Amino acid sequence: MENITEVTEFILMGFTDNADLEILSFFLFLAIYLFTLMGNLGLITLVIGDSRLHNPMYYFLSVLSSVDACYSTVITPQMVVDFVSEKKVISFIGCATQMFLAVTFGTTECFLLAAMAYDRYVAIHNPLMYVVSMSPRVYVPLIIASYAGGILHAVIHTVATFRLSFCGSNKISHIFCDIPPLLAISCSDTHFNQLLLFYCAGFIEVVTILIVLLSYGFILSVILKTRSTEGKRKVFSTCGSHLMAVSTFHGTVLFMYVRPSDSYALEHDMMVSIFYSIVIPMLNPLIYSLRNKDVKEAIKKVFGKRILCG
């Protein structure tokens, strides 16, 4: 009988083995991570500290910021450490944990963006009744459901992936433990896993994008009925940042997961993963801050107080 040795740890190969490029990447991604934390935690602090931001729209935004901060924390610190490590090793349990958390926060963000689109529709359709229509009885369950959906999706894929055998190469051609590169090195039949990934990710994408499209379809009908130019400008300002965040996030996720497995190109996909898991969490606070009047006013208020105190 042939002895089969199961893998007990994995090696994250990353996107380069050039020593000079690794040092440069270390400082670059460390700066991105610190900027991500500063931006997202700063936005959460603004929402908590400024009474003008105490409404469902900004509660959703603060939850999105917490998800982005956690999502980046699951991936970036490990990658940064690997840039200056001789052995880029992650344990079997560590890999499973990283994948579970990455899928949880990534999926939660999909659901949250859909909930935020619905929230924008409610606010614009009947602004006078917004606080009543989007009361804690409505937005709190939406937030909880987003997390629950993310956790359930992560459990499905983590269990399905780590029940496979890893008895050959333990080198993952990626920056973190993601589903496609793990399936690529498994010595088991991964056909079921590939179908599971395609249909689960596809279902989530279709449902959440449909909610976004319907919400913004209704918003557009409201805009067309609005005669006031100032009213239209305010609506576009409010919704533009959310549409930008939705487009960038869903575009990369669709490209990464909802396509035939034989079209995967791990090196190319790695760059896409960096964008949606590291760059987008950094950009979201900027997108929402620069295009949102209330957030900009809150920032000016904070810095104004510091200047006066100084």
Curated annotation (Swiss-Prot):
Potential odorant receptor. Belongs to the G-protein coupled receptor 1 family. One of its GO terms (cellular component) is membrane. Residues 1-23, 74-97, 153-194, 257-269 are extracellular. It comes from the Eukaryota. Pfam families: 7tm_4. One of its GO terms (molecular function) is olfactory receptor activity. Glycans are attached at residue 3. It comes from Mus musculus (Mouse). Disulfide bonds join 95-187. The chain crosses the membrane at residues 24-44, 53-73, 98-118, 132-152, 195-215, 236-256, 270-290. GO terms for biological process: G protein-coupled receptor signaling pathway; sensory perception of smell. InterPro entries: GPCR_Rhodpsn (IPR000276), GPCR_Rhodpsn_7TM (IPR017452), Olfact_rcpt (IPR000725). Keywords: Cell membrane, Disulfide bond, G-protein coupled receptor, Glycoprotein, Membrane, Olfaction, Receptor, Sensory transduction, Transducer, Transmembrane, Transmembrane helix. This is Olfactory receptor 5T7. PROSITE patterns: G_PROTEIN_RECEP_F1_1, G_PROTEIN_RECEP_F1_2. Residues 45-52, 119-131, 216-235, 291-310 are cytoplasmic.
